[in-house]
Amino acid sequence: MQTSKYLLATERDAEWGLTISTVGREEIVPGEEYPTKGHADGYYFDIKKGRTLDEYQLLYQPEGEGVFSSAHLPETKIKAGDIFLLFPGEWHSYHPSSTKGWKSYWIGFKGKNINDRVKAGFLSPEKPIYHVGYS
């Protein structure tokens, strides 16, 4: 089941330096088709071909497991308690394990504030996965 919200930002909103474009959650049960139908145009992707976005997205997986790959990272296992960051213009693909599924929460965002953090080296496409745990 997927619940998501896509938000439209105005030029005035962008003056804050960070705008939110999407938030949501999804639970994929073992054996369920992925990606699920219902993604907005520009977000749906074929896991074999991957995609690029024009925003950052932070995804948190509190349950299950799967894999993630990007232009800077070969296929890497994602496990419960991991977060991973998608970078604008960076090719990527990910999907849950067909035998375990996963729960996922995400937020999409963009703006000068996050761009500055990346330029300063706080975040990098070479190291997009962090294990933060779960409760």
Briefly describe each language-model feature range.
Residues 72-87:
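Short acidic-glycine-tyrosine-enriched beta hairpin
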Residues 22, 93, 128-129:
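Conserved beta-strand positions that form and line the central face of beta-propeller blades
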Residues 5-8, 116-135:
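Amphipathic alpha-helical segments enriched in hydrophobic/aromatic residues interleaved with Lys/Arg
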Residues 75, 89-113:
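Ligand-binding loop in jelly-roll beta-barrel domains
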Residues 1-76, 98:
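Generic protein-terminus/edge-of-domain signal
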Residues 30, 63-65, 83, 89-91, ...:
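Short, charged/polar surface micro-motifs in flexible loops or helix N-caps
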